[in-house]
Amino acid sequence: EVINVTKVDIISGFLGAGKTTFIKELIEKVFAGEKLVLIENEFGEIGIDGGFLQDAGIEITEMNSGCICCTLVGDFSVALKKVLDEYHPDHVIIEPSGVGKLSDVAAAIENVKEDADIEIEGRITVVDGKKAKMYLDNFGEFFENQVEHASTIVISRTQNMTDEKIEACVHLLREKNDKATIISTPWDQLSGDAIRHALEHGAEIEGLFEHH
């Protein structure tokens, strides 16, 4: 009997960074046709309306156990196990609240691994390119945690930035994380395959995404 491992992607980032838009891109381009569950906690940007998801054949499980980072491993693990038992999804996307620490969310998922066949595929942080420096200065602890623990960093709003600004932003992020794949190409110009490749293969293919 083949055990299907559910892949989990965590999409972190501050409120307004563009997480919801990126998740829509993932759902439409990358995970189309897969059994997918999106878990967002109620403080997230609930910009994805039920209708959109139902059309895509995705069931929404609302987590009302409060902010993942507050309840940490307690309720979150229970909710995640319930989702896995009920839906047996191929993929779970978790959108923690804006100030959630990525390391805490990843630790909570690792905790569930003992009882369930899951693996973390990507720890993705979406960063508003125009605000990265301001976030670092003002919300250092949370923002650094999201950047340092990411396997892929997606810079949003790059279509409105000069190349110098984008380079400065990449440099700033690289100081905190020299291993993650950094995608600075506007997402709508990337194919689903390119995005999937970035999530799965990490830093090997950085050359594809460096913005010229």
Q: At which residue positions do the language-model features occur?
A:
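Short, flexible, solvent-exposed loop/turn segments with mixed acidic/basic and small polar residues
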Residues: 1-2, 212
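Nucleotide-state-sensitive switch-loop elements of NTP-binding domains
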Residues: 3-12, 17-136
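Alpha-helical segments flanking ligand/cofactor-binding loops in enzyme cores
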Residues: 28, 144-145
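Conserved beta-strand/loop subsegment of P-loop NTPase cores
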Residues: 37, 92-93, 118-127, 146-158, ...
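Charged helix-capping and loop-helix junction motifs
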Residues: 138-141
